[in-house]
Amino acid sequence: MAGNAYLTRMPMGIAGAVTRPRDLTIEPVTLDHQKQFASYGLAGKYVNDKFVPLESGDTIDKVKGVLVRPYPITSYADLAYLGVNANQVGDNLKRGYICVKVTAGTAPSAKKGDPIYVRVAGGTAGSPVGTFVLTPDATAENTPQLVSAELMGPGEADGRVEIAFNI
């Protein structure tokens, strides 16, 4: 039987996936179908009792969790194709360990305990608002530190890292 041999370590995981399922608190949330997250593993806030992505100009204190990658789920594109215009239920990581994709900084050289920052303004196509970054922008207000989170060690070359959130 053919297989893969991991000579250094196994892959980090999928962005938005919980990495340590024993030590966590996840709450079910209503997602707003008119304000969709671009991907899993992004920081979110509450607006009108719905968990939605951050918007440019939000402050770091608005961050109330991380969107968890659920299974199974029907994608927004599939729901739109079927003509469903209702809010979905999703998962919000309130406390625990999760894999996220950082859009600035070098994930393989990250160290355990390093700070993690969240883009709240100055978003670009490569680093949109709500993503996690390892290094703050030159304009520090764009990427404030999320003091309730820290890195758990080096990540993958494509930017995936494990963070501890509210631990």
Language model features with spans:
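Surface-exposed, low-hydrophobicity beta-strand/loop segments enriched in small/polar/acidic residues
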Residues: 1-167
